[in-house]
Curated annotation (Swiss-Prot):
The name this protein goes by in its record: Ribonuclease Z
Gene Ontology molecular function, alphabetical: 3'-tRNA processing endoribonuclease activity; zinc ion binding
Family of the protein in this entry: Belongs to the RNase Z family.
Record-annotated active site: 67 (proton acceptor)
Assembly and oligomerization: Homodimer.
Natural source organism: Streptococcus thermophilus (strain ATCC BAA-250 / LMG 18311)
Length: 309
């Protein structure tokens, strides 16, 4: 499981950073890639990676500002051009208006998609659980931005314990159907009368990962709720230390406020993105150092960077 950041800048592209987009790679878990936001130029960024567009099965949009959605119609169209590869349907989650925006762009440009796009629009009345399958659940909560904006909490369900095959062999269990029964939690009796207690040969379930990805926001308790105990918290850092007033007026956060959220949420790691173009080189180092005075495990991500979870 990895995060890869396709765009880490704020507002508009710069020479160092493209606008907002990242992917959560779940290839080992479910053979899928999930995208979060799709700003202008996202598909160009993908060309610099190993990401295959057909593997992108779900797209989660945080809000309707252009730097988070202007790349979406183009990405969907390019995904359709992969005619030599199997086409699979795609799900788009986002605020009310995302369906109209995408479909209007598709229709007016004469684009034809070779797959179906299923939309799940989110409003004040549909916050909470927005997606669930047998491996993952995704929750959304409203943040505090200048327009309706959400953050997402991706929860991997606990993984089943593993079967200790060597211990079973040592106990005299023949390889075959009995292994499957024991793996399913069934106690078995061998031909010689030996009773095998399944739980003695299965490790404890492994706790699933929690990944929190926030959209643009002022400092808010919703960010803490979404980030509670997260293995990774992705939080915007449009502004730096001392910029709290201007950050609030523009609906954004500083690095220090993001660090406070991570601390209050007891997150394990804080990844800062959505960085203003005015922060370069030495400024980035200071921004990270300042945030670490509040939350030590802080890192400012750069475009195309991969982070293992």
């Amino acid at each position: 499981m990895e995060l890869q950041f396709l765009g880490t800048g704020a507002g508009q592209p710069s020479k160092a950073r493209n606008v907002s987009s990242l992917v959560l790679k779940l290839l080992d878990e479910i053979n899928e890639v999930w995208m979060f936001d799709c700003g202008e130029g996202t598909q160009r960024q993908i060309l610099e990676t190993t990401i295959k567009p057909r593997k992108v099965k779900k797209i989660f949009i945080t809000h309707m500002h252009g730097d988070h959605i202007f790349g979406l119609p183009g990405f969907l169209a390019s995904r359709s051009f992969q005619s030599s590869e199997e086409q699979t349907d795609l799900e788009v989650y986002g605020p009310v208006g995302i369906k109209q925006y995408v479909m209007t762009s598709i229709r007016t440009s004469g684009t034809r998609l070779s797959y179906h796009v299923h939309f799940k629009e989110i409003d004040e009345n549909s916050l909470g659980l927005v997606m669930e399958d047998d491996k993952f659940a995704v929750y959304a909560d409203k943040l505090d931005h200048t327009i309706f904006c959400v953050g997402y909490r991706v929860v991997q369900k606990d993984l089943e314990g593993t079967l200790d095959a060597e211990a079973l062999k040592a106990a005299g269990v023949p390889f075959g159907p009995l292994f499957g029964q024991i793996k399913n939690g069934q106690d078995v009796v061998l031909e010689d009368g030996t009773k095998i207690i399944a739980k003695d040969f299965i490790s404890a379930p492994k706790k699933g990962k929690v990944i929190t990805i926030l959209g643009d926001t002022r400092k808010t308790n919703a960010s803490v709720r979404l980030g509670l105990g997260a293995d990774v918290l992705v939080h915007e850092s449009t502004y730096g230390k001392g910029d709290e007033k201007i950050a609030k007026s523009h609906g954004h956060s500083t690095n220090m406020q993001a660090a406070q959220v991570a601390r209050d949420a007891s997150a394990k790691r804080l990844l800062l993105n959505h960085v203003s173009a005015r922060f370069l080189g030495r400024d980035i180092g200071k921004m990270a150092a300042d945030a670490k005075t509040i939350f030590e495990n802080t890192h400012i991500v750069r475009d195309l960077e991969e982070v293992e979870i």
